């Protein structure tokens, strides 16, 4: 896996090409990502980078977290994220180093991971795009019902994994192959074409596209 960055969704806007074509873009702010730990095969059994970003009030940090940040010699951030490294990746990166948007200067496409917007408890029509039942023709109570979920005597039960009503959203989602429109090093911004998961100010993980 490639080295990525932790950013924050600012919102959406649009930019224009030289030909006057409007491109919808999502603006992602990437403050400096501080390396808090470098995991190795010898000490941890796998290779990875652990980073933090942003700030956190001192009274909201546990003793364990405070000790971990102090050991790395970095300012406490709002969270910890880990990125696996393949052989040969991350060479020369040490604890305390800071990663910024410049690492995406030559990147064409990225995968963006975030937590989708929570929708609460939803029915099958909204959650799974089920077709509604007849509005008339004798149907007066089950317009948006899931319908038959257990068949008849055989099998006479509901299979595991059956799409039904339930909690929708608020889960980790990755949008793949988003085109990088612009990298603004001065303002620590990345502009990607299209939408990314989650609400404004939500944390995002940006990595070079796996399928590019």
Swiss-Prot record:
Keywords recorded for this protein, A-Z? Methylation, Ribonucleoprotein, Ribosomal protein, RNA-binding, rRNA-binding
Q: Which SUPFAM superfamilies match?
A: Translation proteins
Name a Pfam family for this protein: Ribosomal_L3
One Gene Ontology biological process? translation
Q: Spell out which residues are annotated as carrying N5-methylglutamine.
A: 153
Query: What is any one of the record's Gene Ontology cellular component terms?
Result: cytosolic large ribosomal subunit
UniProt KW Iron keyword: no
- Spell out the post-translational modification annotation for this entry: Methylated by PrmB.
Q: Does the keyword Ribosomal protein apply?
A: yes
Q: Which InterPro entries match?
A: Ribosomal_uL3, Ribosomal_uL3_bac/org-type, Ribosomal_uL3_CS, Transl_B-barrel_sf
GO molecular-function term, one example from the UniProt record: structural constituent of ribosome
HAMAP family per the record? Ribosomal_uL3_B (MF_01325_B)
Question: What is the protein's quaternary organization?
Answer: Part of the 50S ribosomal subunit. Forms a cluster with proteins L14 and L19.
**Which family is annotated?**
Belongs to the universal ribosomal protein uL3 family.
The free-text function statement in the UniProt record for this protein reads: One of the primary rRNA binding proteins, it binds directly near the 3'-end of the 23S rRNA, where it nucleates assembly of the 50S subunit.
| Designated name of the protein | Large ribosomal subunit protein uL3
Q: Which organism is it from?
A: Shewanella denitrificans (strain OS217 / ATCC BAA-1090 / DSM 15013)
